């Protein structure tokens, strides 16, 4: 478990994972990317926290016996990020929707959620097709410190 603390507030949040890899402040909260810290069989956890630091949605990107290294992380304003994980030549995007969507059944492998059937999601995870260009990309720091709690 990873415990993060907002720099300006006393609020703390516990997340699955061990390493806070990237953090972005977006219009309606924060987007956090957390890994286990093991590149040989890695999982990427993507969290959307609202401005009061409540976890509104989370998703796991992982595949059994498959290495994963997070790279090429960039922000596409206002509420989207692009990154590489399993292979540097392929890209993924994670967008925070303006309002949650209801879904029946889960996402396609290797995207995993805690709720396998009917659920409400704020995060939309997609594999980006080749040839799609990044436009207006820049990094926005978010105010979190983290520590591992044993």
Regions found by a protein language model. Give the residues of each.
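Short beta-strand elements that form the blades of beta-propeller/WD-repeat-like
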Residues: 28-40, 72-87, 127-136
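Repeated scaffold domains used in trafficking and secretory/extracellular systems
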Residues: 15-29, 63-76, 109-130, 145-149
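Charged low-complexity stretches with an acidic bias
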Residues: 42-71, 75
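C-terminal charged interaction modules
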Residues: 82-85, 91, 102-141
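Structural motif
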Residues: 39-47, 89-98
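Short, well-structured hydrophobic secondary-structure segments
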Residues: 6-54
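Feature marking well-ordered beta-strand scaffolds used for ligand recognition
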Residues: 2-4
